[in-house]
Amino acid sequence: SFWDFSQTEDFFKLSIPEIIEDVNQNNIDHNFHVETKFINSIVQGEYRFLHDLKFDEMLHARIIRPQSYSHRFISIDESIYKYLKDHNLELFIKNSFVAILGDDEYEVIKSLNRVKNSIKWEQVDKLANDEVFNLIDKNNKDTLVVKRGGEAFHENIPEIKSYKNSNYKTLTSEFNKPYLMHGSIGPSASCSIYKNGKFVIYSHSQAIYALKSILSNAFNLEEENITLHFMPGAGCYGHNGADDVTYEAALLSKEFENKYILLKWTREDENCWEPYGSASKNKLTATLDENNKIIYWSSEAYSDTYLTRPMVGKLEYFVSQRFLNNDFKKYKAEPRTGAHMGIHRNLDPIYNFKETRLVKNLVHDLPLRTSALRTLGAFANTTATETFMDDLCIEANIDPFEFRINHLDDNRAIDLLNDLKTQMKKDKLSENGFRGIAFSRYKNSASYCAVGVELTVSDNVEVELKQAWISVDAGEVAFKEGIEAQVEGGFIQAASWSLYEQVDFDNNEILSKDWDGYKIIEFDNIPLIKTSVINRVGFPYLGVGEAVAGPTGASISNALKRALGERIKSMPFSQENITKQLLG
């Protein structure tokens, strides 16, 4: 390893050539092309993902789950055991945690529902007793003040300011975002063997080293007795089911020693049991003075937590732990106070408003399991901010680019907006098309991103994206093609969130069990995307992948307002939601 080599005599004899030119110069070619690793074998079906692992002495496993988080195992029809024996299958039951295993994966899959139907469960508590946005309003909350710079504080919450000046105009707005899935194209999986007191585990978790410590704690083993390999599976951009399935595979391998256990979640498992991005609500108030400058800005964010990653001493964050221990109580999350943490990420606007009132509300006892999903609270907060900015610019009768620039001191932000404006001017507006723009700087410290969208709305109230323009400033450009791929992929994901995605549930269970129940964007509504990358030579390199999400949601909403003449206040901007609001 590097560390071994660094201790040798040869290491200190290395001759490092003097760098004649600073790396922050124009001698770097930013336009090179990189071939995706293993792309040929992936396309040809030769490449092995974690799901494709094969070992001798291997058992395939599936978890048998109840309807929802609060179901207790009561009994099983004993006649099922003869069926299991005849088909060479094993059943593992510990309290309310149930798994089926066998050396023939197809037999395991075929038998899954048969065994599930033989089990009697008791519902300990309802999943929900009201519509989630009503619960957000009425449930208990931890409420904190957020100050400029993005940190949160346990201080007295100021009242919303009002003005008596008749020349001032005060507007209010509200924005709702539903629960969102990670929506990984493949379900989570893990493979584990426990042999001679040691684990060897394969996982596609984002947090391999942290997970190793957690498993050490969970199984009371020294970390040196756990080998945890990262192996590619479905990407997750946050906390999906990858950690849960790794824990479950390890648990089963400890019960069935000396055998590899390949555990795959089903599509229904992934959709119903992963931690979601929280439903959220934003409430805003702003006042324009006689010169159409914003002199007061109030923004409140309401949401469940964005952090329930398993950690040492917090094994209850594994979804199976509640069933292993028959512990169905809800655990109270603690509010995070660091700059631009979960709920209040990008709540602090980049604009130079004279006075701000920023408040985060961590709402307790909401129905669904939540954790980190790409951008955390920034998607909702940026969408709320930038749609409200558009409402204000319409009220002031000022061009949306000009109105934003009037409230900016940051020259990079101003340059970005002008770059987007230049891009959009080059392309003719399509027939019946409407345009919207939005911009932000992710976390007010990462990349700047501005998005323009053109869309049409059919007589059937179906939204079609026609064109999109992205301007991005990620500091000095090291790999232009990579930046373009990141922001264009992020645009498509955020457009899908904005127009289609929503986790549906009732009092008893999650209803979005498959792709029919959880709609995502399809190829026929992906617009022509044009991307401009501003190269800031000599400036720090900035993270870029998440910067586009909020501006995408807001630009779509802003184009829709121009098309419909009314602000649609709840995502997704689907035919159902638009019609419901317009018809009252």
What role is predicted for each listed range?
Residues 1-584:
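Cofactor-binding beta-sheet edge motifs in enzyme active sites
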